Amino acid sequence: MEIFWNTIAQYNEATWWTQLLITAAGILLTTQLYRKPTLWAKRSMKIYMVFLNGWISIVYYMMYCGARGHHHILAIFWGVIAVLWLWDLFTGYTPFERNPKYKVLVGVLYAMPFLYPLLSWARGMEFPMMTTTVMPCSVAVFTIGLLLAFSRRVNLLVILFLCHWALIAFSKVYILSLIHISEPTR
């Protein structure tokens, strides 16, 4: 678990200004989709999603998570999601047509990337060794919220990849918690 938090600390120390800009761009583009869902706004959001998932793949996993086992696989995984968004940009498959049916759930999902840092603080963590808005979990819940908010027709491959990633991550957390519980205390 120490390697996990150390890699997060290194990532946050080196990229926190960029993470703030990426988060601000995401807020701006999401707001634009709600207020003025023009073709430009929709394409800009897809370009942002290509960038965001590419960032997780290259910067987060390849540059800062090298000490973790299997980081290449996760980098490829998030790279595939970036390519799926790129494909969507050129095909126009996901039209980002608003669906107000799940407003409450979407609100919760949009809030989660901002709650992760607060939960880290509540657990006694401090910057830079804490979760932030531009990390895999945050990006995954934001993406699910975005696709749910604009769910008239969505790219199911993106959803399938995110669900597979979530299952892998959940099982990893469960196994690590069992290891942590079974460690003898001194």
Label each PLM-derived region with a short phrase.
Residues 179-185:
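Residue-level detector of conserved catalytic or cofactor/ligand-binding positions
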Residues 40-50, 99-106, 151-162:
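Membrane-interfacial loop-to-transmembrane alpha-helix junctions, especially the N-terminal start
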Residues 1-66:
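N-terminal topogenic module of multi-pass integral membrane proteins
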Residues 7-17, 60-74, 120-134, 172-179:
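Membrane-helix interface and helix-disruption motif detector
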Residues 70-144:
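Membrane-proximal helix-loop-helix units in multi-pass membrane proteins
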Residues 25-29, 139-146, 162-170:
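Hydrophobic, membrane-inserted alpha-helices
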Residues 63-66, 148-160, 167-179:
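Membrane-helix boundary connector in multi-pass membrane proteins
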Residues 51-59, 109-120, 162-174:
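Aromatic-anchored segments of alpha-helical transmembrane domains
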